[in-house]
Regions:
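Bacterial N-terminal signal peptides
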Residues: 2-14
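N-terminal Sec/ER secretory leader and immediately downstream segment
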Residues: 20-131
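Non-transmembrane, amphipathic alpha-helical segments
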Residues: 73, 77-80, 84, 92-99, ...
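Generic structural concept
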Residues: 86-89, 108, 112, 151, ...
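Secondary-structure edge/capping motif, primarily at the C-terminal ends of alpha-helices
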Residues: 92-99, 118, 122, 157-161, ...
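Short, charged, amphipathic alpha-helical segments
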Residues: 105-109, 129, 169-172, 194-201, ...
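Extended amphipathic alpha-helical interaction segments
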Residues: 134-220
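A cross-kingdom marker for long, charged
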Residues: 215-267
């Protein structure tokens, strides 16, 4: 699978306006987006599950369940709810991929609570049983399908609520959780081939532009501004000179910034 290695877009760093949404590359779009003429719209965001297609090359990913306790209390801010929901979708895959299927019931429960708080609870209920069944069977393929459907149905519900910004934050939260897991795994067991998977400056650039183009009521929140600053720093950390291979020190820097971003996303 080469989806991660052909990921995202723009190399320019600027402040995107609401009318200048960064373009999403086709390989990050869920297949369903191509089945209807009206599928691509302001609510369309990169699929968290697509990110994991290539990350499976980094086996095992790094996983620590300690942060799941933080999700027991729901944040009041809807933007933080969305970011955390994205990290939970990613957690579901990482838990099974690393042999921690016993954590999936907790993750599924948190997913349902967060989706309900965002107004998308009814759609998510139907996926909870599937997540548990696939996790118990350790069926990563079907689990990814259920997680993709979870993200897609939340996206649809938010479309009905006319709240596209939250869809973008869910996607960002998922990518950050995946990146932290992958970068920590590569840091512990470094090879150039594994490290190459991480160095996607265009991905960091896309998400920096994406959150910069959100409604000012969200994009100007202090923690969002800080996350955007960190994403620009991550883009710099991921930049490799032509013909150069990533080094262990560069992987450590990516892991460090990714950890800062995930910590912010989980607040």
């Amino acid at each position: 699978m080469n989806l991660w290695l052909t990921l995202i877009l723009f190399l320019s760093i600027g402040i995107a306006t609401a009318d200048e949404k960064p373009e999403i590359p086709e390989d990050l779009l869920d297949d369903e987006h191509f089945r209807t003429e009206t599928a691509l719209n302001e609510f369309t965001v990169p699929s968290i599950v697509k990110v994991f297609d290539e990350l499976e090359k980094i086996s095992l990913l790094a996983y620590n369940s300690a942060h799941l306790k933080r999700h027991e209390r729901l944040p009041l801010d809807r933007s933080r709810l969305a970011l955390r929901l994205g990290t939970l979708i990613a957690d579901g895959f990482i838990a099974v991929q690393t042999g921690n299927s016993d954590d999936v019931p907790t993750i599924a429960s948190h997913l349902s609570r967060y989706a309900k708080a965002l107004g998308a609870g009814d759609r998510i209920k139907r996926h909870a049983a599937s997540l548990l069944d696939h996790a118990k069977a350790k069926d990563l393929v079907k689990l990814k399908g259920a997680l993709a459907a979870t993200q897609r149905d939340v996206e649809r519900e938010l479309a009905g609520l006319r709240d596209p910004d939250l869809s973008h934050l869910i996607s960002l939260g998922g990518w950050l959780q995946a990146l932290e897991s992958a970068s920590n795994a590569v840091e512990k067991k470094f090879t150039v081939e594994r490290a190459r998977t991480l160095f996607r400056e265009d991905v960091a650039d896309y998400y920096a532009e994406s959150i910069g183009s959100l409604n000012p009521s969200i994009s100007e929140k202090p923690y969002i501004l800080k996350m955007r600053e960190l994403l620009h720093g991550l883009r710099t950390a991921m930049s490799l000179e032509e013909g150069k291979e990533p080094t262990e020190e560069e992987v450590k820097e990516v892991a460090r910034v990714a950890s800062q971003l995930v910590t912010s996303a989980r607040q």
